Swiss-Prot record:
Domain S4 RNA-binding: 39-102
Gene that this polypeptide is encoded by: rps4e
Protein name listed in UniProt: Small ribosomal subunit protein eS4
Keyword Endoplasmic reticulum recorded: no
CC annotations in GO: cytosolic small ribosomal subunit
């Protein structure tokens, strides 16, 4: 690792990039997503969308305010994008949602609607005055009622980030697995196994191909009977 860069061969496995074309790749800036669960905007634009051939051209495009992430202009080429973020390029009327594939890597799926985003509640914080702060998987924080539980998901209207819908984490919920050997698979929660030890809870998920079990923290609620946002196919 060197300053704002890291070696391509050491880049997270979630990044769908070639490893031997050059030695270095931009390191994502600290922010909403971890390095393993996010990637720098320059990688998205240059390596995945191929809107330019090199970092200098990408920096120019970003400096001109031509790229939005979740409805907001982003100009830092190292800005971190991750799961269910939406990248928009108004000049070509294009929107893409970041999803995890069954290969364990990030993919960009074209979408027509960039006005909604699904977020997972990773934890809650009790504030003074009895207020509750929701902490979401993309770093968003917001004040809400205590009706929301950790591991539930909410649909946010973008770019104002206001809650529009709420999906509970429970038996029957439609979920996507975001990590592990079942990464990218979608199914319904059949059983939640609570472990009375330091080991993680597990979830049994049913799909048309059969049932499988995965770690609870790998599960992301995406709707009830069908995915609640574009770009995710059950």
């Amino acid at each position: 690792m060197c300053g704002n860069h890291l070696k391509r061969v050491a880049a997270p496995r979630t990044w769908p990039i070639t490893r031997k074309t050059s030695k270095w790749v931009a390191k994502p800036m600290p922010g909403a997503h971890s390095e393993e669960r996010g990637m720098p905007l320059v990688v998205v634009l240059r390596d995945l969308l191929k809107v330019a051939d090199n970092t200098s051209e990408i920096k120019k495009i970003l400096h001109e305010g031509k790229v939005l992430v979740d409805g907001k202009v982003r100009k830092d080429y190292r800005y971190t994008v991750g799961m269910f973020d939406t990248i928009s390029i108004p000049a070509i009327n294009a929107n893409y949602r970041v999803v995890i594939g069954m290969d364990g890597k990030f993919h960009l799926v074209p979408v027509t609607d960039a006005s909604a985003k699904i977020c997972k509640i990773v934890n809650k914080t009790a504030l003074r005055g009895g207020k509750i702060q929701l902490n979401l998987h993309d770093g968003t924080t917001m004040i809400a009622s205590n009706d929301y539980k950790t591991k539930d998901s909410v649909i946010l209207k973008m770019p104002e980030r206001k809650i529009d819908q709420h999906f509970t984490y429970a038996v029957g919920s439609l979920v996507m697995v975001t990590e592990g050997k079942h990464s990218g698979e979608i199914g319904k929660v059949k059983e939640i196994k609570v472990v009375r030890s330091s080991a993680p809870n597990t979830v049994v998920i049913t799909t048309p191909e059969g049932d499988f079990e995965t770690i609870e923290q790998y599960v992301f609620v995406i709707g009830k009977d069908s995915p609640a946002v574009q770009g995710v196919k059950a």
